[in-house]
Curated annotation (Swiss-Prot):
PANTHER family: ALKYL HYDROPEROXIDE REDUCTASE C (PTHR10681:SF121), THIOREDOXIN PEROXIDASE (PTHR10681)
Keyword vocabulary terms for this entry: Antioxidant, Cytoplasm, Disulfide bond, Oxidoreductase, Peroxidase, Redox-active center
Disulfide bonds: 205-211
A Pfam family this chain is assigned to: 1-cysPrx_C
Cross-referenced CDD domains: PRX_1cys (cd03016)
Record domain Thioredoxin: where: 6-161
Miscellaneous comment as given in the Swiss-Prot or TrEMBL entry: The active site is a conserved redox-active cysteine residue, the peroxidatic cysteine (C(P)), which makes the nucleophilic attack on the peroxide substrate. The peroxide oxidizes the C(P)-SH to cysteine sulfenic acid (C(P)-SOH), which then reacts with another cysteine residue, the resolving cysteine (C(R)), to form a disulfide bridge. The disulfide is subsequently reduced by an appropriate electron donor to complete the catalytic cycle.
Protein name (Swiss-Prot/TrEMBL): Peroxiredoxin
Top-rank taxon: Bacteria
Record-listed E.C. numbers: 1.11.1.24
Role according to the record: Thiol-specific peroxidase that catalyzes the reduction of hydrogen peroxide and organic hydroperoxides to water and alcohols, respectively. Plays a role in cell protection against oxidative stress by detoxifying peroxides.
Length: 215
């Protein structure tokens, strides 16, 4: 299975990793919490530096969502440490989350994070993993484009809301063009349920298959 990209809905592979915060076991060390694993091509590169600063600036928001951050690249621990020190010294931002030092590329190959035509650097990817260790979202970005932290936070909030309320989340939520901050109720599974839903005061509906509500 080496090199196969894990799929959404599968359990995150059990991995023992070296990080700037010591050894960790994934996903075990994050049981009971969500975590966002994000890989970056290399330390001491401009786009990756802007991403690390952006993640750190929003770290408290992730923690309020019971969500931890962990970075990853094919670099050694001392490279991560020197880069983090540079960010603190030159940019005034202290990186508080751990960064995986995958110097041999074993973790990256296991997660399918090395593109054959892009050399040996890790691709720019995001895994969102839930408290049970299940992969809930995977996002890839091109090497030349940095990630949007607002969207990653939105995805975590959306997944948590979907799990808690048993609903689906519309585009651009919570500022959807049709239903604003409402959420979508799963379609009715019978004619009777569809009729009841259209008559219910608990929902608003465009039609029996498109009903929504506030949460």
């Amino acid at each position: 299975m080496e090199g196969r990209i894990p799929l959404i809905g599968e359990e995150f592979p059990r991995l023992e990793v070296k990080t700037t915060h010591g050894k960790k076991i994934l996903p075990d060390d994050f049981r009971g919490k969500w975590f966002v694993l994000f890989s970056h091509p290399a330390d001491f590169t401009p786009v990756c530096t802007t991403e690390f600063v952006a993640f750190q600036k929003r770290y408290d928001e992730f923690k309020k969502l019971n969500t931890e951050l962990i970075g990853l690249s094919i670099d050694q621990v001392f490279s991560h440490i020197k880069w983090i020190e540079w960010i603190k010294e030159k940019l005034g931002v202290e990186i508080e989350f751990p960064v995986i030092a995958d110097d041999l590329g074993e973790v990256s190959r296991r997660l399918g994070l090395i593109h054959p035509s892009k050399g040996t650097n890790t691709v720019r990817a995001v895994f969102i993993v839930d408290p049970n260790g299940i992969i809930r979202a995977i996002v890839y970005y091109p090497q030349e484009v940095g990630r949007n932290i607002d969207e990653i936070l939105r995805a975590v909030r959306a997944l948590q809301t979907s799990d808690e309320k048993g609903v689906a989340i519309p585009a651009n939520w919570p500022s959807n063009e049709l239903i604003n901050d409402s959420v979508i109720v799963p379609p009715a599974s019978s004619v009777e349920e569809a009729r009841e839903r259209l008559e219910s005061k608990d929902f608003e509906c465009y039609d029996w298959w498109f009903c929504y509500k506030k949460v």
